[in-house]
Amino acid sequence: MASEEASLRALESLMTEFFHDCTTNERKREIEELLNNFAQQIGAWRFCLYFLSSTRNDYVMMYSLTVFENLINKMWLGVPSQDKMEIRSCLPKLLLAHHKTLPYFIRNKLCKVIVDIGRQDWPMFYHDFFTNILQLIQSPVTTPLGLIMLKTTSEELACPREDLSVARKEELRKLLLDQVQTVLGLLTGILETVWDKHSVTAATPPPSPTSGESGDLLSNLLQSPSSAKLLNQPIPILDVESEYICSLALECLAHLFSWIPLSASITPSLLTTIFHFARFGCDIRARKMASVNGSSQNCVSGQERGRLGVLAMSCINELMSKNCVPMEFEEYLLRMFQQTFYLLQKITKDNNAHTVKSRLEELDESYIEKFTDFLRLFVSVHLRRIESYSQFPVVEFLTLLFKYTFHQPTHEGYFSCLDIWTLFLDYLTSKIKSRLGDKEAVLNRYEDALVLLLTEVLNRIQFRYNQAQLEELDDETLDDDQQTEWQRYLRQSLEVVAKVMELLPTHAFSTLFPVLQDNLEVYLGLQQFIVTSGSGHRLNITAENDCRRLHCSLRDLSSLLQAVGRLAEYFIGDVFAARFNDALTVVERLVKVTLYGSQIKLYNIETAVPSVLKPDLIDVHAQSLAALQAYSHWLAQYCSEVHRQNTQQFVTLISTTMDAITPLISTKVQDKLLLSACHLLVSLATTVRPVFLISIPAVQKVFNRITDASALRLVDKAQVLVCRALSNILLLPWPNLPENEQQWPVRSINHASLISALSRDYRNLKPSAVAPQRKMPLDDTKLIIHQTLSVLEDIVENISGESTKSRQICYQSLQESVQVSLALFPAFIHQSDVTDEMLSFFLTLFRGLRVQMGVPFTEQIIQTFLNMFTREQLAESILHEGSTGCRVVEKFLKILQVVVQEPGQVFKPFLPSIIALCMEQVYPIIAERPSPDVKAELFELLFRTLHHNWRYFFKSTVLASVQRGIAEEQMENEPQFSAIMQAFGQSFLQPDIHLFKQNLFYLETLNTKQKLYHKKIFRTAMLFQFVNVLLQVLVHKSHDLLQEEIGIAIYNMASVDFDGFFAAFLPEFLTSCDGVDANQKSVLGRNFKMDRDLPSFTQNVHRLVNDLRYYRLCNDSLPPGTVKL
């Protein structure tokens, strides 16, 4: 015993040293090695058993339990049965003897170790494992311990990790399911006993549900439940011990409910009991009582009581989240809704002492979250089922949800409730679409609730009604979606407004427009307060209170303009004529407001509080332009309705809008406002396309400004947008006009002069024999290239989907610039930033204008690129120029993707050199690099080469098909095909999951479209190599997220030759598997059933993978020299 005693002292001092602040990392590593070596010794567990019973040192106990955990989970198979019996007997005794004195984390770890033994040995070798747990629960002294054991068992056995065979996992689940009824009965008993013991009056269980009751239940869903008397009893004051037992019991239930099916085992009395405890979260009176009685030592604090409510709601939500509800359980579900709604009524009840909001503020935040989760689950999972019953009091439910939503104490809580309304509105919209006949009846049922919702959501986004809360919102920090808290708040609110608008357009419009009108009056009335001062114009509103009110009004106007813009889609299409007058009213107001802002230059005005009011004024102006832009599709429809008579009304709308835009296209205007004006101009040119646009003086003015070499250039983004608009005015066909009225000749001349002006400096860069390139600083040259190509690329990109005539004119104008680009390209091949921009330009040309460029010139471009991108140049770009260099190569490969997809024979002569470039030059450079750069583009190019040029590799003749039924095509260019397939195979051995997913999809597509897996060369030389690689990937768990896709791909490959798979491949695969013995291999083979349907086959694949890993784990854990029989 002395050696054990000595070892314990040594271990204690090592542990103390390890966790001491002064211990070096070097020494810590030495101690770690020492401890690991000790744990690996056979029989180390005996020392650990002694340590556990003899030490009070937490570190030593934790280490000893880790040794046991390792022994049981990794080495149990090799432990002699006598030792196993001893461990199974000693550890529970140790737990029983010390559970009251052990720190909770040590006790929980010891429970987990005992459950791990049960996971391996119950019921065969550890038959009393579960009986012991039940006995612990039933004995009052050990109830808490039994509940901890039960929860751990549910966690570890119902959803075990992968270190068990599939058969054992299934056996454990079945064993546990057999115990469910007993366990639920015990838990119900515990909760009821505690409740009854502490209740003022004795509770009687509710009547069991009888069939035929559901109609009454439905109509009374928001009335007091039959158990209301019970739910109205004062909540008992629990002592600490009882609260602890109840919280453990509820935690057990929540975990059990996460995996057991809904069935009669979940009795009405259990549900009612859970609801009793759910009241702990929402009964403020009881919390106050608890705090009054809190002076007595043994009473539970209000916070602890709140936690019981949270746990009970977790149980309810676990049941709610199950989509599949058996018929016999539906009644219970209705009872649950009834009882929860009863609690919701309690929470949202107004009385003198409490407003709803103050009551919600007093509740535990987690409890509110759980309640919101319940409502979300009710609407998303069960409303469809419940709402179809005519007895369901849907309006009362919405009233409750309304009160609950608009009294939320936090922004997050409010957002979550808006989500629920969004789900409800989506449900309603889809219901109406599927039952158009009942549309009126459905809408009438909900109309009042929806109008109320709309009004309240609109009030919530206005400072006029909600200033205190709105000012708390952060409008500076961007979240993951690149929006601020305020923007998110506004966006979510406007989504609800839009969804109501879709259902009730007239109501929504008549609610929103007057509110907008009020705020517009304030804005339009500012003109009278503008005075001229020495330095310009000043807004003569200085009183602090007036400034604050103006700030609020401007913020509200900005939000309401966004709301009006969001609703634009509900005025077009089939309803254009019916809602024309409303839309016209809106558009006229918007045109008036934008012109007003531009004319009196509110964006440049001096104000009393410049840091607040100036951004407000700029924002309103920008939002008015953006709202008008949202109506561009309506204007386009208006344009096509009036195109013959060009009614004055329409002409005025467009020309006034241009008068509002033109003054803003200036370097003196703030970017936010400038960009809003540019976007509106683009929409007029692209979406509306009125014939007379080009002749409006304001548009002429913009043309002159942009083509004037001496004018200051706008910021990049604005310059690109304005040039796009001007180009589109000249290039896009006018709607509803025949070809002979399109005035192409004059538009073509104008477009050529526009492009000529925009590319003047760029074309001058071209060296010529007469005037060799004049030296210009490199940075200046780069700037000209960047500025010109960004504009030209955008113009081409925006014309690429248009008519042939538009593209022809575009290319004629661009032709010289394109030739200059090709001439300049070799000079900049070592400047990767310039090459990147040039290749972007060429890629856009290839995608949009390759027909217009013509074959000879296109061939010249491709040949130039192929010559420039030598092996050395590619290596320099990929290996030494970082991300820009890689981007250059990726763009080049993208251009080649366009080339190989081109139908017809024109570019076929390039195929050999493109494949050679890929396989002999690019692939060797990137194959072994861990970085994913360039790989995705290269494999996409290889895939497109195969997909669009299948006959380059497989020549199929009609005669062959007729003669042999299924054509065994003639194979050509076999070495290239094999090399490409090998590259795909290699990519599956690399860690990059995105590349793996992409390439697996490519192979599957080639099989679906071209029967890749059936081709003789693939079938005979590659098929089972691919299956082998994919199986190994599953076994190594390196790409676990793609389990399902890999399983399907293995099935598709195996199904080409099932006989070969079962008879040859599978035995061969198992023979080659290391780490498993012959007997285990034969079990694995036997368990793989010869099913040929997809679900069974993939299930067999996953079973094989799981069990192979399990056997390896077991075998690794056996002591050296173990003889297995």
From Swiss-Prot:
<feature type="modified residue" description="Phosphothreonine">
    <location>
        <position position="204"/>
    </location>
</feature>
<dbReference type="GO" id="GO:0005730">
    <property type="term" value="C:nucleolus"/>
</dbReference>
<dbReference type="GO" id="GO:0005829">
    <property type="term" value="C:cytosol"/>
</dbReference>
<keyword id="KW-0963">Cytoplasm</keyword>
<dbReference type="GO" id="GO:0005654">
    <property type="term" value="C:nucleoplasm"/>
</dbReference>
<feature type="modified residue" description="Phosphoserine">
    <location>
        <position position="208"/>
    </location>
</feature>
<keyword id="KW-0653">Protein transport</keyword>
<dbReference type="GO" id="GO:0032991">
    <property type="term" value="C:protein-containing complex"/>
</dbReference>
<feature type="modified residue" description="Phosphoserine">
    <location>
        <position position="199"/>
    </location>
</feature>
<dbReference type="GO" id="GO:0031267">
    <property type="term" value="F:small GTPase binding"/>
</dbReference>
<dbReference type="GO" id="GO:0005737">
    <property type="term" value="C:cytoplasm"/>
</dbReference>
<dbReference type="Pfam" id="PF03810">
    <property type="entry name" value="IBN_N"/>
</dbReference>
<dbReference type="GO" id="GO:0005049">
    <property type="term" value="F:nuclear export signal receptor activity"/>
</dbReference>
<dbReference type="InterPro" id="IPR013598">
    <property type="entry name" value="Exportin-1/Importin-b-like"/>
</dbReference>
<dbReference type="GO" id="GO:0006611">
    <property type="term" value="P:protein export from nucleus"/>
</dbReference>
<comment type="similarity">
    <text>Belongs to the exportin family.</text>
</comment>
<keyword id="KW-0539">Nucleus</keyword>
<keyword id="KW-0007">Acetylation</keyword>
<comment type="subunit">
    <text>Found in a complex with XPO6, Ran, ACTB and PFN1. Interacts with ACTB. Interacts with ACTB in a RanGTP-dependent manner.</text>
</comment>
<feature type="modified residue" description="Phosphothreonine">
    <location>
        <position position="201"/>
    </location>
</feature>
<dbReference type="GO" id="GO:0005634">
    <property type="term" value="C:nucleus"/>
</dbReference>
<dbReference type="InterPro" id="IPR001494">
    <property type="entry name" value="Importin-beta_N"/>
</dbReference>
<comment type="function">
    <text>Mediates the nuclear export of actin and profilin-actin complexes in somatic cells.</text>
</comment>
<dbReference type="InterPro" id="IPR011989">
    <property type="entry name" value="ARM-like"/>
</dbReference>
<protein>
    <recommendedName>
        <fullName>Exportin-6</fullName>
    </recommendedName>
</protein>
<dbReference type="InterPro" id="IPR016024">
    <property type="entry name" value="ARM-type_fold"/>
</dbReference>
<keyword id="KW-0813">Transport</keyword>
<feature type="domain" description="Importin N-terminal">
    <location>
        <begin position="31"/>
        <end position="97"/>
    </location>
</feature>
<keyword id="KW-0597">Phosphoprotein</keyword>
<dbReference type="GO" id="GO:0005886">
    <property type="term" value="C:plasma membrane"/>
</dbReference>
<dbReference type="Pfam" id="PF08389">
    <property type="entry name" value="Xpo1"/>
</dbReference>
<feature type="modified residue" description="Phosphoserine">
    <location>
        <position position="224"/>
    </location>
</feature>
<dbReference type="InterPro" id="IPR040016">
    <property type="entry name" value="XPO6"/>
</dbReference>
<feature type="modified residue" description="N-acetylalanine">
    <location>
        <position position="2"/>
    </location>
</feature>
